[in-house]
């Protein structure tokens, strides 16, 4: 294994959404040399690799950043850092404008205003969100991208991070990187619990299975101060496809119902954890399977759902289309059987004459 030594001003570990956006901003605002180290390829890596159909953190008209802080605090049952939330919330709309200027399509109404989905979300066509960001970052003259490089440890000196080391995923290279500043953007930790699907499908999950929590481990091993580990976000997902449920619940107002048709969301609550807990309890008590009731939605709403999931979780749209195809085939087979029975009966009558 050969060693490659690199010196840079800023090292960004992880080339997902946060890493690419940080590289783009630094590239725009300074002449500092930036290096992105990404263990996949920045074009389609990170939690937004497949896209997203809404920006779920936006200060909509008539709202203020503190409103978002209050919502997040309530949803997490108080287990939050309000100061960090407020700092983030105050910049949400600015970042959204930057993304739109880069080419992200944000849906607008007849008056040219963003189409809101609830009090904190706006609808987008975001299947290509990650390629847009990757291109913007890579085009900066002072930004260099190292794809397929897995960073494993920080370099420290006198209690300060001075760089990092790692290795090539596809090539037999050891990387020794010195940097004046290091930004960790490796994402969260997926796969901590038993997967929904067995065997080769065990990686069918919402967040990237290769978000291993390595960035957290590197920080802990280096003696860094860590925060907000007290709260674990676990969202409700659609069976088989692991597609988000908020698109259905908020998009068409679908209610959570059990196998008896009872609306159970009011029984447990509507925070993220309560929606998951309620579904688990209903199944444990023998009231499952549980559904999001879409019966009665208009044809236009149905098409909107199809398009929305194509921007984020196409497997859900494909599952619906396949189910519709199977249903049409069953109906067609029933009609053919009915026609055959009628013809047979007519022939029998004719035979008796």
Residue ranges of model-derived segments:
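Glycine-rich loop(s) and the adjacent beta-strand/alpha-helix scaffold that form part
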Residues: 184-243
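Glycine-rich FAD pyrophosphate-binding loop
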Residues: 28-50
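Short, well-ordered coil/turn residues at beta-beta hairpins
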Residues: 14, 179-181, 185-186, 259
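Mobile, glycine/GP-rich and aromatic-enriched active-site lid/loop segments adjacent to catalytic centers
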Residues: 93, 100-152, 228-353
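Core beta-strand elements of the Rossmann-like FAD/NAD(P) dinucleotide-binding domain
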Residues: 5-8, 171-181
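N-terminal Rossmann-like FAD-binding beta1-loop-alpha1 element of flavoenzymes
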Residues: 10-36
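Glycine-rich active-site loop/strand segments that organize a redox cofactor
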Residues: 56-88
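Helical element adjacent to the flavin cofactor pocket in flavoenzyme catalytic cores
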Residues: 126-152, 158-176, 216, 222
């Amino acid at each position: 294994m050969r060693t490659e030594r690199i010196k840079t001003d800023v090292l960004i570990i992880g080339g997902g959404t946060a890493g690419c956006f940080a590289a783009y901003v630094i590239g725009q605002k300074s002449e500092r040399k930036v290096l992105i180290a990404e263990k996949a390829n920045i074009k389609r890596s990170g939690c937004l690799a497949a896209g997203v159909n809404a920006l779920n953190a936006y200060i909509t008209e008539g709202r203020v950043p503190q409103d978002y802080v209050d919502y997040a605090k309530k949803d997490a049952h108080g287990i939050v850092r309000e100061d960090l939330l407020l700092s983030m919330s105050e910049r949400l709309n600015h970042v959204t404008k930057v993304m739109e200027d880069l080419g992200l399509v944000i849906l607008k109404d007849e008056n040219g205003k963003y189409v809101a989905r609830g009090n904190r979300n706006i609808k987008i066509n975001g299947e290509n969100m990650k390629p847009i960001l990757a291109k913007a970052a890579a085009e900066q003259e002072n930004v260099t991208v190292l794809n397929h490089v897995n960073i494993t440890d920080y370099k420290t000196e006198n209690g300060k991070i001075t760089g990092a080391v790692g290795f090539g995923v596809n090539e037999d290279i050891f990387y020794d990187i010195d940097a004046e500043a290091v930004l960790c953007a490796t994402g969260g930790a997926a796969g901590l619990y038993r997967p929904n699907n067995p065997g080769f499908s065990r990686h069918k999950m919402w967040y990237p299975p290769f978000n291993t929590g390595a960035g957290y481990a590197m920080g802990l091993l280096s003696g860094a101060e860590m925060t907000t580990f007290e709260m674990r976000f676990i969202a409700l997902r659609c069976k088989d496809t692991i597609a988000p449920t908020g698109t259905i619940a908020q998009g068409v107002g679908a209610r959570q119902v059990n196998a008896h048709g009872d609306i159970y969301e009011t029984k447990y609550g509507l925070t993220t954890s309560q929606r998951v807990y309620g579904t688990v309890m209903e199944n444990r008590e023998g009231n499952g399977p549980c559904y999001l009731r879409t019966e009665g939605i208009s044809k236009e709403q149905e098409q909107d759902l199809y398009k929305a999931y194509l921007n984020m979780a196409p497997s859900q749209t494909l599952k619906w289309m396949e189910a519709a195809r199977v249903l049409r085939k069953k109906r067609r087979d029933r009609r053919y059987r009915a026609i055959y029975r009628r013809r047979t009966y007519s022939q029998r009558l004719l035979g008796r004459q």
